[in-house]
């Protein structure tokens, strides 16, 4: 998994000679950043009763890792109400995992500037608002926190259509409720000001699919 994410700014004309990256953000917080990879999107499937489920991904980029392996571009599993997934060989999984490289431009026009030491508490609150349950939030936090808490600050923006329009899931049978939480973030040495994001609530009903993932911009 790549830990160093390269980025480019769309607003190249806004760059001033001699400015630091953090000064650029302070002067022009409405920016788009390009990651090199989308890290660890994982998909949980929660049917009301055990059922066969097929999941395919139409991704505007190159997949670099999937687990379990896809067959003919899709996962086919038996999903149980507790989230356990079983493949044709009888092997079980907690979720479906993928990672890829894309040129998607992530939107940082709104978000949060969080001191590194406050990152865990921030994520606990934000992920709960967004609709992750305790297990899902725990797995999200233990994956990302080691990369974030030692930074002076973290610039965090949750991506919605910007992400889902470039990583399209097709799930059969169709879920009753789908939640896709994707966090784009960047370490900072000094704080910046930007409008706070409004985080939408999510209601689980019937067959529910939950995904989380993220991209570090460094």
Residue spans for each PLM region:
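Positively charged n-region of N-terminal signal peptides that target proteins for export
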Residues: 1-4
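Repetitive helical segments and hydrophobic/amphipathic motifs
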Residues: 11-12
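C-terminal motif of bacterial Sec signal peptides marking the signal peptidase cleavage site
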Residues: 15-18
């Amino acid at each position: 998994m790549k830990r160093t994410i390269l980025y480019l700014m769309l607003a190249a004309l806004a760059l001033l000679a001699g400015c630091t990256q953090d000064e650029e953000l302070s002067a022009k917080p409405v920016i788009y950043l390009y990651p090199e990879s989308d890290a660890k999107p994982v998909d949980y499937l929660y049917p009301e009763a055990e059922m066969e489920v097929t999941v395919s991904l139409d991704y505007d980029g190159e997949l670099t890792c999937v687990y379990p392996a896809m067959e003919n571009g899709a996962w086919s599993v038996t999903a149980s109400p507790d989230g356990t997934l079983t493949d044709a060989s009888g092997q079980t999984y907690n979720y479906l995992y993928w990672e890829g490289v894309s040129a998607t431009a992530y939107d940082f026009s709104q978000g949060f500037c969080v001191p590194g030491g406050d990152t865990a508490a921030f994520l606990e609150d934000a992920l709960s608002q967004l609709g992750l349950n305790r297990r899902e939030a725990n797995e999200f936090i233990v994956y990302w926190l080691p990369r974030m808490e030692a930074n002076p600050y973290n610039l965090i923006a949750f991506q919605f259509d910007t992400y889902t329009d470039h990583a399209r899931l097709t799930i059969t049978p169709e879920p009753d409720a789908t939640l896709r939480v994707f966090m784009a973030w960047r370490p900072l040495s000094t704080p910046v000001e930007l409008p706070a994001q409004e985080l939408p609530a999510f209601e689980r009903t019937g067959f529910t699919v939950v995904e989380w993932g993220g991209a570090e911009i460094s």
